């Protein structure tokens, strides 16, 4: 997900997306531990998406003040 797409979301939608990505990350880590993960690059993508969402949320929070 690109930062441009994330910025278009509302705060509630961003928090929901973050929750979804965290769940996906948990499942991917579990698959990796059991040797079932085929697309290891997905781990990195999900981590970076979570970081993007957190960054934009903190930017919005700072701009309010």
UniProtKB/Swiss-Prot annotation:
Stretches assigned to coiled coil: none
Q: Which GO terms describe its molecular function?
A: structural constituent of ribosome
UniProt cross-references to InterPro entries, sorted A to Z: Ribosomal_protein_uL29, Ribosomal_uL29, Ribosomal_uL29_CS, Ribosomal_uL29_sf
Q: Name one Pfam family in it.
A: Ribosomal_L29
For this chain, the annotated S-S bridges are none
GO annotation, biological process: translation
Q: Which cellular component terms (GO) are annotated to the entry? A: cytosolic large ribosomal subunit
Q: Which family does it belong to?
A: Belongs to the universal ribosomal protein uL29 family.
Query: Can you say what this protein is called?
Result: Large ribosomal subunit protein uL29
Give the organism the record lists: Lactobacillus johnsonii (strain CNCM I-12250 / La1 / NCC 533)
